[in-house]
């Protein structure tokens, strides 16, 4: 392991930014600054007084919609270099990235240590960009912890990114030899190309260098025992175009696809023994969402093609098993019409439900329905036992992709404490 990271260190130093944005400072300096629990003059005063909240503000203010993560990546990399981390900017290629704007993952660890505990989240966001703002209308008794911070990424997942960094700095202040690694990836919102690039690289060796991986996503400060699996596909129908005044001269792809869509839409509510998708006590029902339908060219033309995008959240079973169920459902609903079929090759492979660890006391436990980068990181076996995986973070997924994305100061501060608790538990297992 040490030889791998020595080689990587040389590469990182060669590629280091020529214009660091922060003055050098040792790790052993106070890093978190909690606002006073008393009165305050303005929300801006509270943010400015806290290095942690100021850092969160700074990264939320940088637009980083998927494929445009370069600037926020450089900001985070410079911040960590200034605090004596070895920083590796791992290039991640994308056909949609902006010209001259290289995308990269940020992998960082204290310069004197080989990381054994990996702390990770993502730095990309969904569109559109929403500027950073503060709201004190909901504060109670002039309590700074109730200040609401809004903006794209304030929750998903820059809240986790900021809290993870400052939790790590807190731990390193007390224990400079803690073997921590920080990984902030691109592209989580669009398929996980950043995490897959890391997973397939020498930075993720076999056997695993990491005995613990802590993932950051909005979990409302609960420790997640697992999340549903995922399968994406299209339902495709082929017809024959004709003038709408003479529809018998053509074949309507829309008419052909409707029975298949109706059947697929209900698969999560149909018992598995009757041809539906499986459920489980832990995750409940598998859910199906027909998110987009594209068909026809005009109202006066019999449609020759129809395509529907479908997302399935798997509560049990494997993607291959679900594919077989979908194929049978489409075939049965259309009486075996060969012009209507499920197309799986245009979507990613999918993954089964992901079970996670919850053996650290002091957290509420929950499951979630959304997808994460957890399945995109291949976990290699270790001789000393299984690699533990945790999923935790501040904020709610219910606002994460909406125009009301927001988080409170109190939740951000509690997340630092939560991540520190997870890190300290991992250190005790060394």
UniProtKB/Swiss-Prot annotation:
InterPro entries: ArgE/DapE_CS, Bact_exopeptidase_dim_dom, Peptidase_M20, Peptidase_M20_dimer, Peptidase_M20A
Cofactor: Zn(2+)
Pfam families: M20_dimer (PF07687), Peptidase_M20 (PF01546)
Binding positions for Zn(2+) 2 per the UniProt entry: 156
Cellular localization per UniProt: Secreted
GO CC, any one term: extracellular region
KW Glycoprotein (keyword) present: yes
Main location class: secreted
Gene3D superfamilies given in the database record: 3.30.70.360, Zn peptidases (3.40.630.10)
Enzyme class: hydrolase
Family: Belongs to the peptidase M20A family.
Name this protein carries in UniProt: Probable carboxypeptidase AFLA_037450
Species the sequence originates in: Aspergillus flavus (strain ATCC 200026 / FGSC A1120 / IAM 13836 / NRRL 3357 / JCM 12722 / SRRC 167)
Top-level taxonomy: Eukaryota, Fungi, Dikarya, Ascomycota, Pezizomycotina
């Amino acid at each position: 392991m040490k030889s791998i990271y020595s080689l990587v260190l040389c590469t990182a130093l060669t590629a280091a930014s020529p214009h660091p944005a922060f003055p050098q400072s040792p790790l052993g300096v106070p890093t978190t600054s909690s606002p006073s629990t008393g009165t305050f003059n303005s929300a801006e005063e509270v943010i400015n007084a806290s290095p942690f909240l100021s850092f969160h503000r700074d990264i939320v203010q940088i637009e980083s919609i998927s494929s445009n993560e370069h600037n926020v990546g450089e900001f985070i990399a410079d911040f960590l270099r200034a605090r004596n981390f070895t920083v590796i900017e791992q290039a991640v290629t994308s056909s949609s990235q902006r010209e001259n704007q290289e995308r990269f993952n940020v992998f960082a660890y204290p310069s004197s240590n080989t990381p054994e505990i990996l702390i990770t989240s993502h730095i990309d966001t969904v569109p559109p960009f929403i500027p950073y703002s503060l709201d004190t209308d909901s504060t109670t008794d002039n309590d700074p912890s109730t200040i609401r911070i809004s903006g794209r990424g304030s929750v998903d997942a820059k809240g986790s990114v900021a809290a993870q960094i400052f939790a790590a700095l807190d731990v390193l202040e007390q224990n400079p030899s803690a073997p921590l690694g920080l990984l902030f990836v691109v592209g989580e919102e669009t398929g996980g190309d950043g995490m897959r690039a890391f997973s397939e690289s020498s930075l993720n060796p076999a056997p695993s260098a990491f005995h613990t991986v802590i993932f950051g996503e909005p979990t409302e400060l609960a420790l997640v025992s697992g999340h549903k699996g995922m399968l994406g596909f299209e339902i495709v129908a082929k017809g024959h175009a004709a003038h709408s005044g003479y529809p018998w001269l053509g074949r309507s792809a829309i008419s052909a696809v409707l029975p298949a869509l109706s059947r697929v839409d209900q698969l999560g509510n149909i018992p598995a023994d009757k041809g539906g998708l499986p459920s489980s006590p832990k995750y409940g029902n598998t859910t199906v969402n027909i998110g987009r339908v594209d068909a026809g060219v005009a109202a006066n033309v019999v449609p020759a093609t129809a395509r529907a995008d479908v997302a399935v959240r798997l509560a049990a079973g494997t993607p291959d098993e679900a594919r077989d169920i979908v194929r049978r459902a489409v075939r049965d609903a259309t009486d075996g019409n060969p012009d209507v079929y499920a197309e799986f090759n245009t979507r990613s492979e999918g993954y089964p439900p992901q079970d996670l660890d919850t053996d650290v006391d002091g957290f509420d436990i929950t499951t979630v329905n959304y997808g994460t980068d957890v399945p995109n990181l291949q976990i290699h076996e270790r001789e000393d036992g299984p690699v533990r995986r945790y999923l935790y973070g501040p904020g709610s997924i219910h606002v994460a992709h909406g125009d009301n994305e927001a988080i409170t100061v109190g939740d951000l501060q509690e997340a630092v404490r939560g991540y520190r608790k997870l890190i300290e538990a991992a250190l005790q297992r060394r």
